[in-house]
């Protein structure tokens, strides 16, 4: 049997990013052959990714990439916030965003296929299930800027705009904070407006107000509703005395569109009852 030295293990670990014990076992199995050991680890890392695939990945980070006039915002998930902070995981998320901006894939499945080998490698290294949850690409003749909030990178926005980059970035910060649904009233679905109008009308009737006053109340509430959900109508967080539309106009800037994500939106996180697990283990 070939002697497995500490240097051999260290070299294999440097090449694969996997744990020392995993590298040593692979070298033993390969009888000291470095290339064969590396192949064994690649195969096993793929198997490991398969074993972890069923586990809920509800933590993660956002990443963006801007390649000329093409920008991408992606959400990449993992299982724990500990791994979400790992430099290797963050690097993988940035690679996913870069790939999305360069290749402009048509679906999450297509993007996932493009980064599958890198995904398996980082899963093997960190031991958690990971997945590309969602992404969007903006391909435009206009300008693009992105803003990711905080060190944890869990909320962010990609903004398509005309005008000042600094102004657009500030509006991006506003979007993350105020969470508008769209840019302008023209983008609000008519069915949504009618649904709100019906609710407000019923409330006005129930209050016993005269019909003319009730009608004015309804229209006032509709205006308020539209101002709250549209970017242009919202009070600007950095100066609530003016709307975002007013701030943009006075700075010769126009927001054309935006994509806003928050990590984990809509994912049901598994709640682990550790006491129950310990009790069950004690019975075995």
UniProtKB/Swiss-Prot annotation:
Q: Where in the cell is it found?
A: Cytoplasm
Parts forming coiled coils: none
Protein's UniProt keywords contain Signal? no
Query: What's in the GO CC field?
Result: cytoplasm
Q: Residues annotated as region Involved in Mg(2+) ion dislocation from EF-Tu?
A: 80-83
Cited PROSITE patterns: EF_TS_1, EF_TS_2
InterPro entries assigned: EF-Ts_dimer_sf (IPR036402), Transl_elong_EFTs/EF1B (IPR001816), Transl_elong_EFTs/EF1B_dimer (IPR014039), Transl_elong_Ts_CS (IPR018101), UBA-like_sf (IPR009060)
Give UniProt keywords alphabetically: Cytoplasm, Elongation factor, Protein biosynthesis
Protein purpose: Associates with the EF-Tu.GDP complex and induces the exchange of GDP to GTP. It remains bound to the aminoacyl-tRNA.EF-Tu.GTP complex up to the GTP hydrolysis stage on the ribosome.
Q: Which HAMAP family match?
A: EF_Ts
Report what the protein is called: Elongation factor Ts
Coding gene?
Answer: tsf
């Amino acid at each position: 049997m070939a002697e497995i030295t500490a240097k051999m293990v260290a070299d294999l670990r440097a090449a694969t990013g996997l744990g020392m014990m995993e590298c040593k076992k692979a070298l033993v199995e390969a009888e000291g052959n470095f290339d064969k050991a590396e192949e064994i680890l690649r195969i096993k890392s793929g198997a490991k990714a398969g074993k972890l695939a069923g586990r809920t990945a509800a933590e993660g980070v956002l990443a963006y990439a801007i390649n000329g006039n093409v920008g991408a915002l992606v959400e990449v998930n993992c299982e724990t916030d500990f791994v979400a902070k790992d430099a290797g995981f963050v690097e993988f998320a940035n690679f996913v965003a870069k790939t999305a901006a360069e290749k402009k894939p048509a679906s999450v499945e297509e993007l996932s296929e493009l980064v599958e080998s890198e995904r398996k490698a980082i899963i093997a290294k960190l031991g958690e299930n990971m997945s590309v949850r969602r992404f969007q690409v903006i391909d435009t003749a206009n300008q693009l800027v992105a803003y990711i909030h905080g060190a944890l990178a869990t909320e962010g926005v990609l903004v398509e705009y005309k005008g000042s980059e600094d102004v657009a970035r500030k509006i991006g910060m506003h979007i993350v904070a105020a969470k508008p649904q769209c840019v302008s009233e023209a983008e609000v679905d008519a069915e949504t407006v009618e649904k709100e109008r019906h609710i407000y009308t019923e409330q006005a009737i129930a209050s016993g107000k005269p019909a003319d006053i009730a009608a004015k109340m309804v229209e006032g509430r509709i205006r308020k509703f539209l101002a709250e959900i549209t970017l242009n109508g919202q009070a600007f967080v950095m100066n609530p005395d003016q709307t975002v539309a007013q701030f943009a106009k006075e700075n010769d800037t126009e927001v054309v569109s935006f994509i806003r994500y928050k990590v984990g939106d809509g994912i049901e996180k598994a709640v682990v009852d550790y006491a129950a697990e310990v009790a069950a283990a004690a019975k075995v």
